[in-house]
Amino acid sequence: MSHALRRAADRALVPIGYLLLAVAASWPLARDFATYTVGDVHYDERHAIWVLWYTAQAIAGHVSWPDTTHLLWPHGISVLVDGVGPLNGVLALPFWPWGAAAAFNGVALTGLALSGWCLYALARTVGVSRGPAFVAGALFLLWPIR
């Protein structure tokens, strides 16, 4: 195997590994991906789904961005200061064809996998070797509070 091919395989296997770990850690999210949302506080889930939907509508040009009077009418609010935020709205875009629950769960799963991968990248940047860096990312992904 050439050096470039091995390097490309290493770069692909790490995020795939974190994605598989995120699926295992969040089970049964993958099984119920388009039908149920994860979490215990249902009003938070509904609010988050609304922000994801509003971001998709803004990207499509159907609503104004970033201010809306749909919340806190008549004064409105900027969705940029919301905890869900526009980045999650962008990450949800590929999952919308499967419905609102899939968009919410897709963002949750993507965020979980990316948290491990980003800590891996940070550890590699500061000189930690691949194995311990992967373990550090896995521990961060599995940690209950981020």
Where are these regions (language model features)?
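Membrane-interface coil-to-helix junctions
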Residues: L21-S115, W143-P144
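Membrane-interface starts of transmembrane alpha-helices
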Residues: A9-L13, F95-V107, V128-A136
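Membrane-embedded helix bundles of polyisoprenyl
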Residues: Y18, A24, V107-V126, R130-R146
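Membrane-interfacial loop-to-helix junctions in multi-pass inner-membrane proteins
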Residues: A4-D10, T37-V41, R124-G131
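Start-transfer (signal-anchor) and selected internal transmembrane alpha helices
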Residues: M1-L29
